[in-house]
């Protein structure tokens, strides 16, 4: 008798996943941005518009169609002001301007947890302000 040995009534059925695509690994992912500087008497304002793309990808190692994660497309924008006579900046930013929501990832619970599937959802449109300095 070994009190630390855990027996398992059903060890499961082996599944061959060789040749399957890696989960959470898109075939294509990129971002592109446009910057424009506006030089004024008191400082420089930089505007940036960016586009982020990630192609569809597998949600799990089993490559099941109902667990695929759809492609993601996001537009982001920032406006940064830097004064000519200072070593600081202030930045306004917005991410996911279109407020698009996607499945971000899948999580499959074990049979002990009922075998349910859970998903994370990408962030909604977010706004922010930041301050910075250099020294």
Where are each of the predicted segments found?
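C-terminal extracellular loops and terminal segments
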Residues: 1-76, 121-125
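C-terminal beta-signal and adjacent terminal beta-strands/loops
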Residues: 50-60, 81-135
